Amino acid sequence: MMSFSTSLILASGSSARRMLLENAGLAVQARPVDLDEEALRRSCEEQGHTLSQTAIALADAKANLATRDVGFDELTVAADQILDLDGVAFAKPGSVAEAAEHLRRLRGRTHVLRTAVVLYKGGEKVWEHLASPRLTMRDFSDDFLKAYLEREGPAILSCVGAYRLEGPGIQLFSAVEGVQDAVMGLPLLPLLEELRELKVLAA
């Protein structure tokens, strides 16, 4: 029976992704997985994968791990995001000092967020999608950067690019091309459309 809402397993501990799903009226069960993302990234690079293909592979691997021992009709969603600066991938910063270095490299330039989402039903993948929002950072001053890092602190270490667009990080930018949910790590509208196609949400 179709309804306005449905229940999803989210293969992530991301509070931003969970918030997006819950705000859309979906019931979410977070199920973070233990995935060696760096090893998978290296494997993808060795195989000559693009950053878009790597983002999809990472999301797929997370969903695959989270779907072990799930019911036949259970739905699992997983996502991944890679910051692409002229073909160079950025990982999440490991320290505030590394976050500062990332932001200096991104300052005054345009980067792309390769944002992948996959959907599993039972143990089988039924759908995947990739969004690629483009973001341009303004040429902010060193004083602004220092104040920004003091304001945000370790909170930005969980964010690729060292910014939260839904917070003070918006002040880093002069232009954003793409929907905010994709920037936040989950292309929500395409996912909702697929859930309607699967007849688990009312059309």
Swiss-Prot record:
Molecular functions (GO terms): nucleoside triphosphate diphosphatase activity
Transmembrane spans: none
Protein keywords: Cytoplasm, Hydrolase, Nucleotide metabolism
EC numbers for this chain: 3.6.1.9
Catalytic activity: a ribonucleoside 5'-triphosphate + H2O = a ribonucleoside 5'-phosphate + diphosphate + H(+); a 2'-deoxyribonucleoside 5'-triphosphate + H2O = a 2'-deoxyribonucleoside 5'-phosphate + diphosphate + H(+)
Function text: Nucleoside triphosphate pyrophosphatase. May have a dual role in cell division arrest and in preventing the incorporation of modified nucleotides into cellular nucleic acids.
UniProt protein name: Nucleoside triphosphate pyrophosphatase
Native source species: Gluconobacter oxydans (strain 621H)
Lineage: Bacteria, Pseudomonadati, Pseudomonadota, Alphaproteobacteria, Acetobacterales
